[in-house]
C-alpha cells in the first residue's frame, strides 16, 4: 500500500495514546494505522493520510497537547522499508489483515 505520510506521536501510557489518537482523528482527515508499545510505558501512535492532513493532525497535538508528548514527527512519502515496518506492526497487533505477497 502507498501512503502520502505517516504521523508519529509518542506518549507515556496507553490511555494517553488513545487520547492523542482521538485528537488527531478529530482534527484532520487521517486514519489510524497502528500503535507500538515500548519499555517504560511509552506508546507511539501512527496515523496516515495525505501530507497536509497528517501535518495538521500532528501539529494540533504539538500545539495543544492533551498530555505530555515525548516526540512527534511527520514522515512524508515514507520509504518502502518504513511502510513494511509499520504494516508488520499493524498486522502483529491485529489492526491490519495479513496479506499473502507470494505469487
Predicted feature residues:
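Short glycine-/aliphatic-rich beta-strand segments at the starts of folded cytosolic domains
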Residues: 1-12
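Short amphipathic alpha-helix segments
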Residues: 14-28
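A common structural junction motif
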Residues: 28-31, 62-70
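RNA-recognition motif
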Residues: 34-40
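Metallocofactor- and cofactor-centric catalytic cores in central/energy metabolism, strongly enriched
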Residues: 41-46, 72-82
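Helix N-cap motif at beta-to-alpha junctions
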Residues: 48-54
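Short, low-order "capping/linker" segments at domain edges
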Residues: 81-100
Amino acid at each position: 500500500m502507498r501512503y502520502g505520510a505517516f504521523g508519529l506521536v509518542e506518549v507515556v501510557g496507553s490511555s494517553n495514546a488513545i487520547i492523542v489518537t482521538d485528537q488527531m482523528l478529530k482534527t484532520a482527515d487521517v486514519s489510524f494505522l497502528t500503535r507500538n508499545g515500548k519499555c517504560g510505558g511509552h506508546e507511539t501512535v501512527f496515523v496516515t493520510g495525505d501530507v497536509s492532513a497528517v501535518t495538521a493532525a500532528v501539529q494540533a497535538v504539538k500545539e495543544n497537547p492533551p498530555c505530555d508528548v515525548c516526540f512527534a514527527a511527520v514522515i512524508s512519502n515514507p520509504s518502502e522499508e518504513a511502510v513494511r515496518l509499520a504494516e508488520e506492526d499493524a498486522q502483529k497487533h491485529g489492526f491490519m489483515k495479513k496479506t499473502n505477497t507470494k505469487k
